[in-house]
């Protein structure tokens, strides 16, 4: 179930403060965060976030099409290694 509109989008305060400081100084440094749950707002456009995926920080450059989504959607936590090849020779034995 989606979040109620009267509550507004969830953004961690520390993340919003870091973006506001960079916007005031007109700098674009990578912002390291563990907050995968924060919603992307229009103030984030043009910034790069290093979103934690459980073992490392994945760089995510925010564009207009990402507004309204969560930061965690762009940093996958699972690595797909591919399906195991079917070995027919060993099955016959």
Curated annotation (Swiss-Prot):
Keywords: Ribonucleoprotein, Ribosomal protein, RNA-binding, rRNA-binding. GO terms for cellular component: cytoplasm; small ribosomal subunit. Pfam families: Ribosomal_S19 (PF00203). It comes from the Bacteria. GO terms for biological process: ribosomal small subunit assembly; translation. GO terms for molecular function: rRNA binding; structural constituent of ribosome. InterPro entries: Ribosomal_uS19, Ribosomal_uS19_bac-type, Ribosomal_uS19_CS, Ribosomal_uS19_SF. PROSITE patterns: RIBOSOMAL_S19. The keyword NAD does not apply. The keyword DNA repair does not apply. Protein S19 forms a complex with S13 that binds strongly to the 16S ribosomal RNA. PANTHER family: RIBOSOMAL PROTEIN S19P FAMILY MEMBER, SMALL RIBOSOMAL SUBUNIT PROTEIN US19M. Belongs to the universal ribosomal protein uS19 family. This is Small ribosomal subunit protein uS19. The lineage of its organism: Bacteria, Bacillati, Actinomycetota, Actinomycetes, Mycobacteriales. The gene is rpsS.
């Amino acid at each position: 179930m989606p979040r109620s509109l009267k509550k507004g989008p969830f953004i961690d305060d520390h993340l919003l403060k870091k973006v506001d400081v960079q916007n005031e100084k007109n700098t674009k440094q990578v912002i390291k965060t563990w907050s995968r749950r924060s919603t992307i707002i229009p103030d984030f456009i043009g910034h790069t976030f290093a979103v934690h995926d459980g073992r490392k920080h994945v760089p995510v450059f925010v564009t207009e099409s990402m507004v309204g989504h969560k930061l965690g959607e762009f940093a996958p936590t699972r690595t797909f290694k591919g399906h195991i090849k079917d070995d027919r020779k060993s099955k016959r034995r």
